[in-house]
A protein has these predicted regions:
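Conserved nucleotide-sensing/catalytic segment adjacent to the nucleotide-binding pocket
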Residues: 23
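Metallocofactor- and cofactor-centric catalytic cores in central/energy metabolism, strongly enriched
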Residues: 18
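Glycine-rich phosphate/diphosphate-binding loop of Rossmann-like nucleotide-binding domains
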Residues: 1-11
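Short, flexible loop segments at boundaries between secondary-structure elements
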Residues: 70-93
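Hydrophobic/aromatic beta-strand patches that form the interior of the parallel beta-sheet core
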Residues: 10-12, 39-41, 84-89
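Glycine-rich phosphate-binding loop
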Residues: 26-75
Length: 142
């Protein structure tokens, strides 16, 4: 399939801050400074208040991302990064009960993440590459 008109896109998968020693805010700030993107799309798992939503919805927001880290004052948003920030995610956990230090996840979490991430990736790729057909996007992402 010939592919023309691909828009430039950069991506990173920062992982868990405990393994890198850097917070998501630090990594995103450095990336924005180095790449100078038109916008930033942040994908993360989300915490739900209702069990019925776990793995059954996809949420998008143009107000940025509020990482569940100890540094609650640092949010990934346009005010902090200087570019529009779109957050996308799938609710995959919820707090067990008020005041408890436990979280609940779906029993089929691996399946929820595999299917949900594929759907979310397809939607983001389609939004970022509107000139490409679905067949071309499938071919590119293999």
């Amino acid at each position: 399939l010939p592919v023309r008109g691909i828009r430039p896109v950069a991506a990173i998968a920062p992982g868990v801050s405990g393994s890198t020693g850097l917070t998501l805010c630090q990594l995103a700030g450095a990336m924005v400074e180095a790449v100078r993107p038109a916008a930033l799309i942040c994908v993360d798992s989300l915490c739900s208040t209702e069990g019925a939503r776990l793995g059954r919805s996809i949420q998008f927001s143009d107000t940025g991302l509020h990482p569940a880290q100890a540094d609650h004052a640092r949010h990934l948003d346009a005010g902090m990064l200087g570019v529009p920030v779109v957050a996308a995610g799938i609710p995959t956990l919820m707090e067990a009960e008020e005041g408890a230090d436990l979280v609940v996840t779906p029993r089929a979490l691996d399946s929820v993440i595999a299917h949900g991430s594929a759907l979310l990736a397809a939607a983001i790729n389609r939004a970022l590459q509107p000139r490409l057909s679905v067949a071309q996007l499938c071919w590119l992402t293999g």
